[in-house]
């Protein structure tokens, strides 16, 4: 089997079989480029799901094993995405993450949403936060794969991304409340921002052999 990089569906094709022209049907690593991460622009990072956390990683593998079995394919590596945006005013980390404490202001939190169900979201343990964190950090960024990927050097697009963060929908994480065809999660947050900023989110590929559940949902909702 020949593994290819796709976002929300399968992660491999029979050897010698050509793709149907849809995004992800390629074995090129052209998306992985060396960039000057100190210059203004937008950089995308792909982090293995559960990097640095054995529980999340194990749960992710179980989820992917079940999904792959139902879809009749081999399991993929799952990825979580985050952005680093640099503008004249500074460097900002944009990411969706669990709420760890009540110091969200220090992490540039602009919104929160429920995890699993709206009822459970009454408790901090079952809420996520959207960060626009000046001089922030991406936990376990050292484990990022084929990253960073420079999406644009355009200052206007970079500022647009930053301005859009508070406008991102905050539906229940792990559910398809938006009717997008798949669950909403951290990847949906990032792809929504990229699509709404005017960049081509559909042309972005995950690392080879990987999958980013929720990515397509963000694009679908951004088009509405």
Protein language model features and the residues they cover:
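Residue-identity detector for glycine
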Residues: 8, 16-24
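Non-catalytic ligand/cofactor/substrate-binding and regulatory segments of enzyme domains
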Residues: 24, 28-180, 222-224
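Active-site nucleophilic cysteine motif
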Residues: 78, 175-197
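Short helix-capping/linker segments at secondary-structure and domain boundaries
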Residues: 88-91, 195-203
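Surface-exposed patches in mature extracellular/periplasmic domains of secreted proteins
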Residues: 173-177, 201-206
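Short terminal or interdomain "cap/linker" segment that borders an active site or interface and mediates
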Residues: 207-224
């Amino acid at each position: 089997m020949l593994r290819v990089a796709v976002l929300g569906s399968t992660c491999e094709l029979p050897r010698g079989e050509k793709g149907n022209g849809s995004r992800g049907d390629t074995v090129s690593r052209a998306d992985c480029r060396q960039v000057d991460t100190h210059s203004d622009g937008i950089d995308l990072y792909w982090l293995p799901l559960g990097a640095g956390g054995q529980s999340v990683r194990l749960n992710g593998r179980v989820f992917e094993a079940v999904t792959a079995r139902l879809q009749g394919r081999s399991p993929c590596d799952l990825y979580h995405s985050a952005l680093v945006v640099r503008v004249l005013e500074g460097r900002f980390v944009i990411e969706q993450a669990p709420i760890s404490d009540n110091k969200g202001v220090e992490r540039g939190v602009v919104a929160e949403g429920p995890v699993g169900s709206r009822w459970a979201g009454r408790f901090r343990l079952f809420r996520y936060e959207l960060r626009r964190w000046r001089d922030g950090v991406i936990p376990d960024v050292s484990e990022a794969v084929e990253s960073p990927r420079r999406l644009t050097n355009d200052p206007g697009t970079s500022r647009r991304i930053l301005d859009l963060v508070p406008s991102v929908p905050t539906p229940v994480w792990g559910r398809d409340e938006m009717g997008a065809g798949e669950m909403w999660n951290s990847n949906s947050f990032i792809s929504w921002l990229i699509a709404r900023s005017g960049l081509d989110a559909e042309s972005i590929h995950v690392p080879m052999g990987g999958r980013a559940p929720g990515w397509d949902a963000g694009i679908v909702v951004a088009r509405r």
